[in-house]
Amino acid sequence: MQLLTPNEWMTKAASEIPDDQSAVLFMLHCERYTDPPDGDYSKLLLTPNGIKMANDIGTSINRKIRLLRSSPIERCKQTIREVIKFIPPEFAPTKDTEIKTSKDFFELLGNPSPKESGGVGWFEYFHYLQEHDVEAAQGISLEAETKHILDAIFAETLDSREAASYTDDSSTTAPLDLICSHDCHVIVLASALFDHKTDMSLTSKWCQFAEGLLFYGSRRNFTAFWRGQKKTFVDYL
């Protein structure tokens, strides 16, 4: 599979996905504007560079798009729309393919909001999850957060047999599902599946714009990619 993104490791990972396996790109939205003056991050949209980033990703895609899924937050839906604008016609989704939104790609089980408002704290929450400190994370485990997200990702994906029947006579390549979510969801998955650790502040260990995980397989037997690593999970959670 071909995929060109600002995160070079994802391009290499995509090339390792077998043609006959249905794939999922689960990614953070593209570059957005910075801190809002009113404190409402949900209103922030993509910058011109973020739009170009999404357009460039779309241009590179060489698999038929089957499903479009997103957080209900506008910048995530905007990222999907900007990606599919530039997908080559033979791989573009059909005109009646809607972007399905789900709170599972927006909300977490836990509360990483600021401590002064009763939350755990943003960077603190993910640190406690990674350290398996359930008490400090206010009763939420990394496994619980991960299962919640994985179940949502694989709820509508194809298994290998369905993927084979989905392809038409002129193609032996299985389809691609696009899902746009948030950095917190990407970090949860990377932490659980690849033992990724973040710092207590914003560093390169945090998820970058348009970065995410690639998957193929089924919920009970899937392969995942993250920052140069590849792992297969059987009956996980």
Residue ranges and their predicted role:
Residues 1-92, 197-200, 204-222, 226:
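Active-site-proximal alpha-helix that buttresses catalytic centers in soluble enzyme cores
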Residues 65-74, 96-102, 178-179:
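Short glycine-rich phosphate-binding loop at a beta-alpha junction
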Residues 149-223:
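Active-site-adjacent alpha-helix immediately C-terminal to a catalytic or transition-state-stabilizing loop
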